Amino acid sequence: MTKSSELYQKAQQTIPGGVNSPVRAFNGVGGSPLFIERADGALIFDADGKAYIDYVGSWGPMILGHNHAVIREAVIDAAQRGLSFGAPTEMEIAMAELVSELVPSMEQIRMVSSGTEATMSAIRLARGFTGRDKIMKFEGCYHGHADSLLVKAGSGALTLGQPSSPGVPADFAKHTLTATFNDLGSVRELFAANKGEIACIIVEPVAGNMNCIPPVEGFHEGLREICDQEGALLIFDEVMTGFRVALGGAQAHYNIKPDLTTLGKVIGGGMPVGAFGGRKEVMQYVAPTGPVYQAGTLSGNPVAMAAGFACLNLLKEEGNEKRLAAKTKQLAEGFKVLAEKHGIPMVVNQVGGMFGFFFTDQETVTCYEDVTKCDVERFKRFFHLMLKHGVYLAPSAFEASFTSLAHGSKEIDATLEAADRCFAILAEEAK
């Protein structure tokens, strides 16, 4: 038995399921999860001392690679002056100014401690600003575990939302409408059936929680137009895509200006940070200037702000955005070529520094229904084969994978060599 397996058994005695976030339990792929002891650059090292090329990156934040020296020193320096004050600091101003510089639609910004806090607060703000109760999300998109967002579609486009988790009251879920990602017709249909009642649309501009699904041409432009026509706010949930799809986020990549944006992951440089922001007239509704209440003991934590500030300043250095996208494209295209070489049907999607692949005969994968038709069992087999060859992919067929600036030619070449061998095994097993 490996040390990771021993630790997993021990963890289950005091931690529900042995993990502090469900996907870490490897339920999506089977087997025991890796317990990580340390990480550096593009590598993680498990409790048994084995190294893996990492394409999870702590689920997105480690865009510069693990344990970056500059971020580490920024954290140490900040910690030496105090861990938390519960009072404003100058670094909060600097951080807000930097985020606004990189994401100009965020004219004012409120820091929080997680992506879930950011989306939950943005939804409350949209409701308060518009005076409307209903919100619209998309099937297959995830926006954190707030009650109003743990909702799935009913049986038909015009039915009320249904809770996707016990503990979410049906009376609460009924205010959440679910449309089909990349389908403007479903959006218009819901607005027509709920005239003057919808406060906002919240969307992952690149859906990263049903693997990696980019928008089809005109989709985001259509959302912007519909929101303007209907008096609803457009919220881009850039917790995953922010600073990763492009330095200015997916909104810069697709040239769309949302009313509100939520951020997480990369913004903290590895520390727990989230943020929401947008048009000044909307943000002025947030307490203490406005009536929409939001607060947090650790919001704007000085150590976390120092880490995020260091991360974003490094990230904005010239050439980094293009380098990240180029190496991710090289990896994604390499997967596709090798799959074709071995006769493995596969769709590969990639935007900026995120990518995903689907074992499927379909020509494209553009929505949740397409994702559900993919071969999850083959993904599970491929995941474990790659893990055996020292490559750590996202342990779920429904999660995106990520590269970092620390992934060099050596790591990408080694990953593709491993993929070549693993695809060969899959092809042989299919005979």
Swiss-Prot record:
Q: In which pathway does it act?
A: Porphyrin-containing compound metabolism; protoporphyrin-IX biosynthesis; 5-aminolevulinate from L-glutamyl-tRNA(Glu): step 2/2
Q: What is its main location?
A: cytoplasm
Broadest EC class assigned to this enzyme: isomerase
Q: Which UniProt keywords apply?
A: Cytoplasm, Isomerase, Porphyrin biosynthesis, Pyridoxal phosphate
Write down the SUPFAM superfamilies for this protein, in alphabetical order: PLP-dependent transferases
Post-translational modification N6-(pyridoxal phosphate)lysine, affected residues: 265
Question: Is Cytoplasm there in the keyword field?
Answer: yes
Origin: domain of life: Bacteria
Which CDD domains is this protein grouped with? OAT_like
Q: Which cofactor does it need?
A: pyridoxal 5'-phosphate
Protein name (record): Glutamate-1-semialdehyde 2,1-aminomutase
